[in-house]
Curated annotation (Swiss-Prot):
Species this protein is from: Desulforamulus reducens (strain ATCC BAA-1160 / DSM 100696 / MI-1)
Subcellular localization(s) per the UniProt record: Cytoplasm
Protein name as it appears in the record: DNA replication and repair protein RecF
GO cellular component, one term: cytoplasm
Lineage of producing organism: Bacteria, Bacillati, Bacillota, Clostridia, Eubacteriales
Keyword Protein transport: no
Pfam families per the UniProt record, alphabetical: SMC_N (PF02463)
Keywords: ATP-binding, Cytoplasm, DNA damage, DNA repair, DNA replication, DNA-binding, Nucleotide-binding, SOS response
GO molecular-function terms, A-Z: ATP binding; single-stranded DNA binding
Family, per entry: Belongs to the RecF family.
Major localization class: cytoplasm
Record keyword DNA damage present: yes
Biological function: The RecF protein is involved in DNA metabolism; it is required for DNA replication and normal SOS inducibility. RecF binds preferentially to single-stranded, linear DNA. It also seems to bind ATP.
GO annotation, biological process: DNA replication; DNA synthesis involved in DNA repair; double-strand break repair; SOS response
Amino acid sequence: MRVKKLSLRNFRNYKEAQFIPHPSINIITGPNAQGKTNLLEAIYYSLRGCSFRAEKDRDVTNWESNHTVINTEVNLSSRLIKLQWKIQEGSKKLSLNGVERPRSELDLFGVVLFCPEDLSLIKGSPQERRHFLDYEVGTLSPGYSQLWRQYAKILSQRNSLLKEIRDHRSKQEVLEVWDEQLYRYGAKVIYLRLQVLKKLIPIARKTHFGLTGGTEELQAKYLSSLVLEPGLSEGQIYQVFSSSSKKIRQMELKRCQTLLGPHRDDLSLAINGVEAKTFGSQGQQRTVTLSLKLSQLDLWYHEFGEYPVLLLDDVLFELDRSRQNMLIDKILNKVQTFITTSFTGGIEETIKGAGLLWQVNAGSLTQKEEF
């Protein structure tokens, strides 16, 4: 998969911009706060229908305008597909080849983002690892994002109801309606997470083994708040969720919190049997993160026969030189990649003949050289 052309109107600090990227490596350089990350955000938005850093669509629109247009041409499976996003206050519309389509059509397009925040994936909170997992599930399982949003909505309403019951403003019988929905949607979320991990973990283990020269073995395990046996069906997870929740009902009423479910789960990562979060060095933790990110590329390829687009937002030079070379070796001439950086660090020599260098200045994009 390749982004062939990107045109922007009123996106962040880009009032009008056109970008015809190299099919392999694109290094986007320039001073801070000039629009490097904005360009990656535009690519991400065009392929996923949302921003990776703004909560509201209005935030991506240039402050002097009330609308944004993103036009993208993508080569996918030997087909040229034209995407257009029109974003206005309170609405956004997607068109594919001139025909208005639902956002679910974007499941065809793959994009993997690697940003500085990802480097804290291992030592960060369980929420960060759940976010990583949910993003991966969402790219491979159509409708998952909507499923998760529905679960989160049910969870919020159930927690509010627990407080009302504790304060004698609602009856406990009302909880049963929300319980059934919580178990049903929660079981679906857990089941889909486990199915994707079943595919992702073997690839990540193989990748990590190669990145470390065969000296480290990566182990990954889904840590559920429920006691789950391996290989359970969605229906069996539902039953475990239901029976386990009923046993702690009084504790939940006391705390006014839902104490079981996918919102409490985590992903355990270990190196040679030792927990990476607590005992891994910074270099080891970053290698685990790199292994997980590269495995996303390979899993997409295994599932769809093409590599997704890779966005490296100011992260390449956060890795040491050996890991930089490992990453470049993995993607060179295989994965269309967009790299933002304030300085190139001599990386041009590593990818000579397979990319373009771009300069961004105050929302203006110019090609500097081919290397």
